[in-house]
């Protein structure tokens, strides 16, 4: 064996070792994230989030707060009881008095309760709106997972197919039937696809963690999804969104619009409360007094003897105190409440306009997104897959070059990713439509 041969063998061994070292580890495939039987469906994800998501649970406590304030507003003011004892220094006279004062709270209780009732209703509507937004967020995060998993499944298949082609070309090169360039071109393509696949795994992990967050789950909790992006989109396309034609009714039933209307009612109730608190009020009172009085001199008793001049006297009094609104009619609070009502009315008008615009835009987006999916699914996607299969078979028969296979494969990737974008657009459009309508699914 000459020196040139030995050098060649060393270089070949080095290349083989380098290629072996460059072999990627076994990354998770798309099946790692999908379980068609025991996985979490979209409906289950929404139900789980409505029950467990921490910020929604915190928002629900505001209803308890409002109900507690409602209970407090219905209570009458407490009566006042006073006790008084008077003693004469260096003497024997004394006086004991017990008084009771009872506020009548005229005109005020009903107004307080009316404000509190409307605040309870507003708190419930605020939670309902928070649920509406949470459902949309869960759908968005669930859709992110489905989108990335679909791309990952695509690259799983492409890596497997390209790997088989690479093995075939390597065998042909070893037999001398194919030029090494063809093998090297496929090797580069295989490494590119493997790199893209690894990136998709990272995106899938991140999307799954974000989904766990909106579900109220820890990042390390086990979670697999049940649905595929295509199944969800096609299922929702077959179902009719309950938007119908009555846009005005839909807008008025939305939780955020109703909450804005409730704020107008609260402001109106505050005006009534302020006006009633500016009226007169009456407190009734009563007291009992016992007086033990006398003089240091002695008097003559009926029997003719001397007796101390001292006696015990009992007094009972009753009356009423009236608060007269002579200068303070609560004018400032009434003016503030009216200004608050005007602001709440404008906020309600803005909420209705925003909801109307959101609904119209969501309907248009949903219609065109469904049409885009139909265009892809009615022929483009299947034809692209068929074209790739034909080119690959032609390559195996020696009718086309490896360049043709690589070109057609990249064209197929573009079509599949375009279909994924169309599916994702349709899913996001239906999410936006459901959010605009206020549907809980």
Model-derived regions, located:
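Terminal intrinsically disordered/low-complexity segments used for targeting and assembly
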Residues: 1-51, 201-249, 298-300, 434-441
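Periplasmic alpha-helical coiled-coil/stalk elements that build and connect Gram-negative outer-membrane
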Residues: 3, 125-251, 365, 369, ...
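Small/polar, glycine/serine/threonine/aspartate-rich low-complexity segments that form flexible
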Residues: 26-38, 79-117, 228-238, 272, ...
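Amphipathic alpha-helical coiled-coil scaffold segments and their short linker/junction regions
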Residues: 35, 45-50, 178, 182-189, ...
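Amphipathic alpha-helical segments within well-ordered protein domains
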Residues: 46, 101, 167-170, 247-248, ...
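A glycine-/polar-enriched beta->alpha junction
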Residues: 47-57, 64-78, 98-115, 125-132, ...
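Amphipathic alpha-helical coiled-coil segments
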Residues: 58-70, 130, 134-155, 164-167, ...
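Metallo-beta-lactamase
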Residues: 200, 255, 422
């Amino acid at each position: 064996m000459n020196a040139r041969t030995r050098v060649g063998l060393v270089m070949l061994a080095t290349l083989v070792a380098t290629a072996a070292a460059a072999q990627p580890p076994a990354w998770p495939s798309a099946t790692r994230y999908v379980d068609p039987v025991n996985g979490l469906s979209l409906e289950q994800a929404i139900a789980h989030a409505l029950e467990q998501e921490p910020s929604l649970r915190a928002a629900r406590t505001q209803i308890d707060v409002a109900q507690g304030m409602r209970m407090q507003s219905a209570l009458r003011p407490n009566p006042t009881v006073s006790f008084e004892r008077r003693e004469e220094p260096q003497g024997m006279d004394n006086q004991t008095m017990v008084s009771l004062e009872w506020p009548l709270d005229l005109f005020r209780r009903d107004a307080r309760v009316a404000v509190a009732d409307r605040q309870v209703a507003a708190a419930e509507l605020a939670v309902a709106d928070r649920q509406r937004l949470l459902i949309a967020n869960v759908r968005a995060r669930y859709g992110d997972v489905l989108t990335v998993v679909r791309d990952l499944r695509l690259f799983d298949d492409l890596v497997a197919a390209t790997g088989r082609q690479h093995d075939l070309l390597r065998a042909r090169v070893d037999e001398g039937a194919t030029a090494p360039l063809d093998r090297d071109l496929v090797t580069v393509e295989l490494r590119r696809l493997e790199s893209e696949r690894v990136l998709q795994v990272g995106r899938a992990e991140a999307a799954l963690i974000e989904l766990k967050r909106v579900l109220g789950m820890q990042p390390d909790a086990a979670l697999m999804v049940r649905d595929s992006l295509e199944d969800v989109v096609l299922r929702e396309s077959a179902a009719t969104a309950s938007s119908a034609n009555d846009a005005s009714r839909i807008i008025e039933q939305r939780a955020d619009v109703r909450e804005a209307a409730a704020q107008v009612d609260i402001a109106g109730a505050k005006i009534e409360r302020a006006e009633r608190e500016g009226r007169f009020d009456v407190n009734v009172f009563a007291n009992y007094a016992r007086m033990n009085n006398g003089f240091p001199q002695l008097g003559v008793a009926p029997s003719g003897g001397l007796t101390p001049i001292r006696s015990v006297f009992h007094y009972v009094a009753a009356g009423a105190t009236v608060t007269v609104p002579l200068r303070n009619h609560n004018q400032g609070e009434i003016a503030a409440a009216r200004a608050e009502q005007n602001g709440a009315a404008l906020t309600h008008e803005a909420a209705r306009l925003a909801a109307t615009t959101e609904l119209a835009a969501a309907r248009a987006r949903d219609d065109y997104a469904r049409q885009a999916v139909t265009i892809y699914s009615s022929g483009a996607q299947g034809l692209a897959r068929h074209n790739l299969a034909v080119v690959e078979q032609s390559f195996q028969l020696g009718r086309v070059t490896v360049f043709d296979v690589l070109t057609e494969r990249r064209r197929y990737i573009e079509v599949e990713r375009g279909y994924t974008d169309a599916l994702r657009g349709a899913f996001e459009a239906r999410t936006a439509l459901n959010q605009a309508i206020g549907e809980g699914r």
